[in-house]
Design a protein with these regions (language model features):
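Basic, Lys/Arg- and aromatic-enriched nucleic-acid-binding interface segment
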Residues: 2, 14-44, 155-156, 160
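Alpha-helix N-cap/helix-start motif at helix boundaries, enriched for small hydrophobics
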Residues: 37, 45, 49-54, 164
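Conserved tyrosine-mediated DNA breakage-rejoining catalytic core shared by Y-recombinases
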Residues: 18, 53-85
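Short basic/aromatic active-site micro-motif
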Residues: 132-152
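Catalytic-site neighborhood detector that most strongly recognizes the C-terminal catalytic loop/helix
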Residues: 69-73, 168-193
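Active-site-proximal segment of tyrosine recombinases
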Residues: 50-51, 146, 154-169
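C-terminal secondary-structure termini that scaffold catalytic or DNA-interacting sites
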Residues: 1-14, 195-196
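C-terminal catalytic core of Y-nucleophile DNA break-rejoin enzymes
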Residues: 8, 70-89, 101-123
Length: 196
């Protein structure tokens, strides 16, 4: 009997502009839930298990919402970006939602998507939109969020790494650095941003 070995592949972060373009293309093509899902994942930095618990009332109107993370049980307050909230409203209207307490990510059968199903859909999206990313999965969204926060920090990159460690509930900045694929040279380049 032939034994199969499954290689574990870690997902990659997506370039921020590529992500925004993908979210807009999915919306344009009528794939409102996937557009919203990828947007929520990249703007909120949540694990997929927490994204799938979101209801429309949580993300539609308020400037923040509170969840208890499934994996850790910890309370987390998530701020909703004003620009992204307009996209949430557009998806809500396009889907003709009538119940704000409905989960955001329901299939046609009115069941919440499974992580496995989303990963299958992501493979299809990667092919259809010719995404230049090695491993596109549900982890990609969280890593994209982390990478954007880190890269936007400039000279405060080490501080951003510590903040991300807290947001991601990692035991140390080293774990966060490895999770996001941040190299020592990227951290050291923070010092090159300073002028004298």
């Amino acid at each position: 009997m032939k034994q199969e070995f499954h290689e574990y592949r870690t997902s990659n972060a997506m370039d921020w502009d590529t992500m925004l373009s993908l979210v807009r293309k999915l919306y344009r093509d009528g794939d409102y839930r996937m557009s919203l899902l990828i947007g929520c994942g990249c703007f909120f930095g949540l694990r997929i298990s927490d994204i799938l618990t979101l209801t429309w009332s949580m993300i539609l109107d308020g400037d923040k919402f509170t969840i208890y993370e499934k994996k850790t049980g910890k309370r987390r307050v998530v701020k909703v970006n004003k620009g992204f909230q307009k996209h949430v409203k557009a998806c809500y209207d396009a889907l003709k939602i009538t119940n704000e307490d409905e989960k955001c990510f329901l299939s046609r059968k009115k069941m919440v998507y499974s992580t496995q199903r989303i990963n299958i859909l992501f493979k299809e999206i990667k092919t259809k939109y010719n995404l230049k990313i090695d491993h596109f999965s549900t982890h990609t969204m969280r890593k994209t969020f982390g990478r954007k926060v880190f890269e936007s920090a400039g000279t405060d990159a080490p501080l951003a790494l510590m903040r991300l460690q807290t947001l991601f509930n990692h035991a140390s900045p080293t774990i966060t650095k490895k999770y996001l694929g941040i190299t020592d040279s990227e951290l050291e380049s923070s010092y090159d941003l300073l002028d004298f």
